[in-house]
Amino acid sequence: MATIRPFMGIRPAPEYAKDVAALPYDVMNTEEAREMVKGNPYSFLHINRAEIDLPVGTDPYSPAVYEKARDTFYEQLDKGIFTQDLLPNLYIYRLSMDGRSQTGLVVCTAIDEYLNDTIKKHELTRADKEADRIRHVDTLNANTGPIFLAYKENADAEAIIDGYTAAVPPVYDFVSEDGIGHTVWVIDSDTEIGMLVQSFANVENFYIADGHHRNASAVKVGLKRREQKP
């Protein structure tokens, strides 16, 4: 059985959300990332591609880059650019473009379900890319890149999501510079959280649609944490 869990998310304050939103870290090179953040000190690329705030020519895999990412992340948290929810929540995230949309849940999944193949993989991973994300996640003590998981049709979950999005206003609703609409709801009701968690009781597997390196890296950091705090 595939399981989901709520968590205390760290997320942008609503007034900063549009500025924080950024493309994935691995779809551009360093110079392109530098260009993208001009005039925007809040872009998440300052955290996910922190070499852009260090001297030109800095090795993007040097310890200084991960330390800079950590410092920027916690500085923005201290300044209120990001806030952390005080209780564990689930989140609904909708992406829209050209009249079409896809809606998903933002949740925690289990390391053990990755290890026992409840979470299915279909790609091999590269050691160098894993090492980069391991250092990033470990240094920041945060998972900064979501993994895109798919699952077979779940009518119960779909009904709960549809009902919630129809009844509750979103916390974010904006269009980013690339023309994609981002709409997010926070599910902070214990009733709906419990119903959604239970709705996955008959879901046998998750399938990694995107994020094999991020998932493998997060698992390895998680295993390291278990060793440190058995």
Per-region residue spans from a language model:
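A cross-family signal for N-terminal binding/gating loops and helix N-caps
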Residues: 1-230
